[in-house]
Amino acid sequence: MSEKLQKIQALIVEQLGVDEEEVTPEASFVDDLGADSLDLVELVMAFEEAFEIRIPDEDAEKIRTVGDAVAYIEERS
């Protein structure tokens, strides 16, 4: 498992209060992990801070699964 994936998983567990086993690449933030719109905003902010990147709103709307987040962050950091 990549270091970035581990860091992303840890952020998701911390922000959403879910078990690490639930955080799979296929997991949807809303449907599988129970995130609401505020959770998603806070999660994007956590990703931006942790990886020192900027995620524009139009890109954030496309990040729907853990795998989406990993791919986006790996491309930009």
Curated annotation (Swiss-Prot):
It comes from the Bacteria. It is found in: Cytoplasm. The keyword Protein biosynthesis does not apply. Residues 2-77 form the Carrier domain. Keywords: Cytoplasm, Fatty acid biosynthesis, Fatty acid metabolism, Lipid biosynthesis, Lipid metabolism, Phosphopantetheine, Phosphoprotein. Carrier of the growing fatty acid chain in fatty acid biosynthesis. InterPro entries: ACP, ACP-like_sf, PKS_PP-bd, PP-bd_ACP, Ppantetheine_attach_site. Pathway: Lipid metabolism; fatty acid biosynthesis. SUPFAM superfamilies: ACP-like. GO terms for cellular component: cytosol; membrane. The keyword Phosphoprotein applies. 4'-phosphopantetheine is transferred from CoA to a specific serine of apo-ACP by AcpS. This modification is essential for activity because fatty acids are bound in thioester linkage to the sulfhydryl of the prosthetic group. One of its GO terms (biological process) is lipid A biosynthetic process. Belongs to the acyl carrier protein (ACP) family. GO terms for molecular function: acyl binding; acyl carrier activity; phosphopantetheine binding. The modification O-(pantetheine 4'-phosphoryl)serine is found at residue 37. This is Acyl carrier protein. The gene is acpP.
